[in-house]
Structure formats: structure tokens, C-alpha cells
Amino acid sequence: RDTGSEKKRLKTPVALNHENEIVSRTLQYVADHVCDKLSVEIVSREVGVSASHLTALFHRQMNISPGEYIRRVKLEESKRLIREGTMNFSQIAAQLNYSTIHHFSRQFKDKFGMSPSEYAKSIQSE
């Protein structure tokens, strides 16, 4: 016996196109606002869907959560700013809207396996 809740609905091209558009708008919004305070709730509101819907779309299309994507974009931007060499780590943390330099440093080390200062030293020796 087949109930409606057990059926997987097939996505029509129009539905897939709409999903792609939401994900594309999300990627663009995060890129344009990398220095702002960003959260799944803020971004989902900006692209006009619920946080849970955005999370489901992101998992389906990108294989990561929107929160993880935001973290990755901010951390990649922090690497760029470190390479640029015009800001200290406190300024970079503030520029990218981290609550504290400790939070920034911890996330950086978790992602890249080295602290921001270790990264800065590694690129100076290249």
C-alpha cells in the first residue's frame, strides 16, 4: 500500500530551475556580504525562503549546509586578507564579523590545520 508520504516526488525542470536560482542567489549574497554578520537565518530571509528550506536545498545541491558554506567563504577571505598583509589578525576577525579573535583563530585552525599566524609564517617562507 502506497501512501503519499512514502512517495518521492520527481522534480520538474521548473522546480529544479527555481532551486538552482535560490542556491545561486545564496552564493552571490554570501560573496557580496562576506564581511557582514551572516547566518542561515539572515541569508534565507534575504533570498526569500525559510532557513530549513534553504538548508535542504543546499544539502541537495552543494552537499554541505549553508552554515558550513558561510564559514568556508569567510575563512577563504581571511586567508586572502592574511596574504594581502595590510591587517593584523584582530582587524581581520573584526572585518569578517567574528565575535572574537579567539573564535576566528579556532575556526581557522579547525579548517586549515594551522593557526592564522602559522599560515602567515608559511606564506612568508614561500
Give residue spans per PLM region:
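Residue-level marker of regulatory loop/turn positions in helix-turn-helix DNA-binding domains and
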Residues: A15, E19, D32, V47
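An amphipathic alpha-helical interaction segment
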Residues: R1-V14, H18, I22-R25, H53
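Proline-centered helix-kink/hinge sites
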Residues: P66, S115-P116
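Short, Lys/Arg-enriched anionic-surface-contact patches
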Residues: V14-I22, A56, I64-V73
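Terminal helix-turn-helix DNA-binding modules in bacterial transcription factors
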Residues: Q28, D32, K37-E41, V49, ...
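Short hydrophobic/aromatic patch on the recognition helix
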Residues: H53-L54, F58, H103-F104, F108
